[in-house]
From Swiss-Prot:
It is found in: Nucleus. The keyword RNA-binding does not apply. This is Two-component response regulator ARR7. The modification 4-aspartylphosphate is found at residue 85. GO terms for molecular function: phosphorelay response regulator activity. PANTHER family: TWO-COMPONENT RESPONSE REGULATOR, TWO-COMPONENT RESPONSE REGULATOR ARR7. Functions as a response regulator involved in His-to-Asp phosphorelay signal transduction system. Phosphorylation of the Asp residue in the receiver domain activates the ability of the protein to promote the transcription of target genes. Type-A response regulators seem to act as negative regulators of the cytokinin signaling. It comes from Arabidopsis thaliana (Mouse-ear cress). Residues 165-206 are annotated as: Disordered.
Length: 206
């Protein structure tokens, strides 16, 4: 789940509680209109929200990583997964991968590379640069479902870690507050004793 997204909980008339998880938003990049339509269809069948672009340059514009010239410099833009073809004119899928991993806003977003060529050095190069997976075309529905499940598991784990971190911070803040209160109580008690002692000394002089 991307930062800022909310998991909706719906209670039907019968009283049974159901949890509706937000759909994954996938940015699909491919210069081939046929391949673009195929991956879009597979993603939609897998209940994903899909945005398609025809080049690496357009992908950078959509993500707002083109030096501020893009049309989607939106602070609330959420992309859960980027799927890109490797061989594209201009900016290749490999170059796009590097640009994404160099950015502060999208470096944590998983990137999957697609290619019709099974070239081992190319695959190793992409994985080394941080690609989540390297898929051979034609991409199958089973590939898309497997990737989706992997992303959802990763995001669920990240949410769990964030939740534990927040709980630990709250506990630490609570302990600090309690310690500060105890120190104040000790100081108040010490001050009261000192004032009582001074009063007794004054009365004894009188």
């Amino acid at each position: 789940m991307a930062v800022g997204e909310v998991m909706r909980m719906e209670i039907p008339a019968g009283g049974d509680l159901t949890v509706t998880t937000p759909e994954l938003h996938v940015l699909a990049v491919d210069d081939s209109i046929v391949d673009r339509k195929v991956i879009e269809r597979l993603l939609r069948i897998s209940s994903c929200k899909v945005t398609t672009v025809e080049s690496g340059t357009r992908a950078l514009q959509y993500l707002g990583l083109d030096g501020g010239k893009g049309a989607s410099n939106l602070k609330d833009l959420k992309v859960n997964l980027i799927v890109t073809d490797y061989s594209m004119p201009g900016l290749s899928g490999y170059d796009l991968l590097k640009k994404i991993k160099e950015s502060s806003a999208f470096r944590e977003v998983p990137v999957v590379i697609m290619s019709s060529e099974n070239i081992l050095p190319r695959i190793q190069e992409c994985l080394k640069e941080g690609a989540e997976e390297f898929l051979l075309k034609p991409v199958k529905l089973a590939d898309v479902k497997r990737i989706k499940q992997l992303i959802m598991r990763n995001e669920a784990e990240e949410c769990k870690i964030l939740s534990h971190s927040n709980k630990r911070k709250l506990q630490e803040d609570s302990d600090t507050s309690s310690s500060s209160h105890d120190d104040t109580s000790i100081k108040d008690s010490s001050c009261s004793k000192r004032m009582k002692s001074e009063s007794e000394n004054l009365f004894s002089l009188l």
